Amino acid sequence: MAERIECAVIGAGVVGLAVARRLAMSGREVVVLEAEEAFGTHASSRNSEVIHAGIYYPTGSLKARLCVAGRLALYRYCAEHDVRHHRIGKVIVACDETELAGLGKYLEQATINGVEGLRMLTTRELEELEPEVRCVAGFLSPATGIIDSHGLMLAYLGDAESHGAALALASPVVSGRVEDDGIVLEVGGAEPMSIKCGMVVNSTGFNAQAVARSIAGIPPQSVPPTHYAIGHYYTLSGAAPFRRLIYPVARQDWLGVHVTIDLGGRVKFGPDLAWIDRVDYRFDESREAAFYHAIRRYYPGLKDGALQPGYTGIRPKIHGPGQPAPDFVIQDQRDHGVAGLVNLYGIESPGLTSSLAVADHVAALLEVASSRREGSVP
């Protein structure tokens, strides 16, 4: 017989933990089911660790709204919970005249999205702020920052557990089924179990589609396609030549190889983008020459041999090569017909920045579902 649990959050990445925290703090009984033996082992720990301002995303999109709201909430949260972070700022640069129009579009979109403090920089200001950067124009985003993503997840988990949530590691959801009075999840691992949940949040990153397909009663047509995109990061040996993050104008279907700086002062370049057909974190060192070429467009002082292989990360894409990047997909009963179920698809960047706002959004959807079930909403 299945054990009854009010709410299960599947996936203990940064978004899943934020959702679990939010639900537990609202008084719900929450269990977090994580397939791996630790939390946050995939996209949540294999990224740039950037707090994004909300510059690039289309007007009115979930990415735009949740990134801006999430950033403001995240800075407050970090200050209140002593999560290491630094509002370091970012300079977006046009490397030549052909990129000026793109730079202008970024600035216009960011202004529409409500990003504060943006400022076009004169050539002299650019030289003073970042003397090692070569460009023809740029603007400053002072709201952009960097963060200790592991520390953030620890804080979210601590909040959730202090409000009664439980984290079950090495507990993969292997199948499930929709019943009239809830959703039954079959959980594997060393001690398999069945749990019946009134609410389920599927926040499993690039596994979200597989989890959804494993639950009988979720319409297959509601599940978007799965695509994997790997990104490589190289680190820079020696002292940091930059004081801020440096992002070139994108020339392809991602933001390009940019400069990030971690809280220890280490400079990282990346990510690039390569489409793969399965999850494989191996580092492809043959991409080194392309990195040197891309970086020297805005940092001509990069010396041969200065780049060292860093790490890779895989983004949970719901679009393929040559297709426009879609919005976050956050589905509830209106999309798939299952009461109490929220599926999160394609929660890549700016997912970390947006995590608190995503959690609020999911909680609101579940509150509506709960009210409908109780008959208070027609």
Functional labels for PLM-detected ranges:
Residues 22, 51, 82-86, 193-199, ...:
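Active-site substrate-recognition segment that forms the wall
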Residues 5-32:
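N-terminal Rossmann-like FAD-binding beta1-loop-alpha1 element of flavoenzymes
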Residues 2, 26, 45, 325-378:
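C-terminal lid/capping helical subdomain adjacent to the catalytic/cofactor pocket in oxidative enzymes
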